[in-house]
Amino acid sequence: LPVLVKGILRPDDASLCFENGADGIIVSNHGGRQLDTATPTLKQIEPLRKEIGKDKILIVDGGIRRGTDILKCIALGADAIQIGRPVLWGLNYSGKEGVELVLDILIKEFIETMILTGCRNLNEITRDLVREA
């Protein structure tokens, strides 16, 4: 069973996780609920990926609300994303059907974003697609 460590924001913490046997990390600031000044997860993807290399699992959790957010995470180095709050909104809205609706919307937005950026597959999602405002 793979072991993933959640709540990682610092490169040195990521290294410690792997030195101690973790199979991957989950970049998370716990939705900003713990510390209102916590670093946004999106800003930590690149430094963490640089620290751990391309072969280690890096999942992003936090702040993902749209398909464009998914593309940004992948472009910056995430292997996968986790979503929480949007799923809860869907669950509250209409139970299982609401969750399915939220997931359908996110998938459609992500595919649309890939099309609009000229990406035919995940391998074509690259760092140059993301710019800071």
What role is predicted for each listed range?
Residues 1-60, 68-89, 122:
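Alpha/beta enzyme core
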Residues 53, 94-95:
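Glycine-centered helix-coil hinge/cap
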Residues 64:
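Short donor-sugar binding/catalytic loops of nucleotide-sugar-dependent glycosyltransferases
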Residues 87-88, 95-133:
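C-terminal extensions of enzymes
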